[in-house]
Amino acid sequence: MKILIDENMPYAQALFSQLGEVILKPGRTLTADDLIDVDALMIRSVTKVNDALLAKANRLKFVGTATAGMDHVDQALLRERGIFFTAAPGCNKVGVAEYVFSVLMVLAQQQGFSVFDKTVGIIGAGQVGSYLAKCLSGIGMKVLLNDPPKQAQGDEREFTELETLLKQADVITLHTPITRGGEWPTHHLIDAAILEQLRSDQILINAARGPVVDNAALKARLQQGDGFTAVLDVFEFEPQVDMELLPLLAFATPHIAGYGLEGKARGTTMIFNSYCEFLGSAHCANPASLLPKAPVPKVYLERAWDEETLRTLTQIIYDVRKDDAQFRREIHQPGAFDLMRKHYWDRREYSAVTLAGGADCHLAPLAKLGFQVEVCDEPTI
């Protein structure tokens, strides 16, 4: 049995080699010839699964994507050909939420505001948007949710109309899939008309899919130079990046928002376990068992946390400025976008760190943000 896997999928070779012969190749450049005599295909979002890719897939029975998004896969085509498909919904939600939170904490420091004075509008209330809302509201921040499809399906959460959210939110963060048809298409959801409505003191973050924002219109909006802030982890035509847009962005990164080590391990193990079930195999993987020990496993707090403490704690684990600096330094080199993703550092999630302190430290909200917490009277570092 041959299993073709994106070479950037962590832990995949060790896991899938238990089931058959593993072939590793760059996901973005897979061709139809690569799928000859292949039984299973394991990919990430850079691989487009379509009729052209499957033209010579004479034995393919299973496709798994170790990502939450699925817009890169023609699922109707797979159903037509009798090929089983699975994804990893929610695998990256923690990493994306922590990316957004890092952006907020750094911008608050740079622009001189408190995150607790800002209203965050979350467009897209799926796995990522919902988790982000839970984290932010858990520490006392005000959140607005917008998701017309979920609202129409009877989701009982409180939703805000897009027009209202755009007016009331200080921060607008995007977490939708990319859709081009239907009643609520998200392609160019944030277009020139909407961008012109946004105030100079508002912040726009896109960590969803590049084409959700019209990048040409965004560039024109930022060129007005009125203080409007935009952050992009995804670009409309990635891996190509508009070099005129780049210097106008507060932060820019190469589609790595969800690239926490835990998230990547979850994605790989989710599709591995699904493939084992498909085969009727007894093998099973737990993502926690794959992870190394955190560099800073425990931090002791001597007093109740405040915003500055929160900034310090979160930046110990992840500071978006590190990725932004590397992106701007290296993006001009050939193939840099994919190389930065391929060789991305072992970023951890907040859950890798335990915060310890007395009852007067009020650690419960930090647990909602994702940290492990331990109430104790003495330092136990």
From Swiss-Prot:
UniProt-annotated catalytic positions: R209, E238, H255
The name this protein goes by in its record: Erythronate-4-phosphate dehydrogenase
Subcellular location, principal: cytoplasm
This protein's encoding gene: pdxB
GO biological-process terms attached to the record: 'de novo' pyridoxal 5'-phosphate biosynthetic process; pyridoxine biosynthetic process
Functional note: Catalyzes the oxidation of erythronate-4-phosphate to 3-hydroxy-2-oxo-4-phosphonooxybutanoate.
Residues given in the record as substrate binding sites: S45, T67, Y259
Pfam family, one: 2-Hacid_dh
Pathway where it operates: Cofactor biosynthesis; pyridoxine 5'-phosphate biosynthesis; pyridoxine 5'-phosphate from D-erythrose 4-phosphate: step 2/5
Keyword Metal-binding: no
Source organism (scientific name): Vibrio cholerae serotype O1 (strain ATCC 39315 / El Tor Inaba N16961)
Positions bound to NAD(+): Q127, V128, D147, T176, D233, G258
Entry keyword annotation includes Oxidoreductase: yes
Keywords: Cytoplasm, NAD, Oxidoreductase, Pyridoxine biosynthesis
Subunit note: Homodimer.
Gene3D superfamilies: 3.30.1370.170, NAD(P)-binding Rossmann-like Domain (3.40.50.720)
One cellular-component annotation, GO: cytosol
Reaction(s) catalysed (UniProt annotation): 4-phospho-D-erythronate + NAD(+) = (R)-3-hydroxy-2-oxo-4-phosphooxybutanoate + NADH + H(+)
Similarity-based family: Belongs to the D-isomer specific 2-hydroxyacid dehydrogenase family. PdxB subfamily.
EC number: 1.1.1.290
Main EC class the enzyme belongs to: oxidoreductase
GO molecular function ontology, one term from the record: 4-phosphoerythronate dehydrogenase activity
Intracellular or extracellular location(s): Cytoplasm
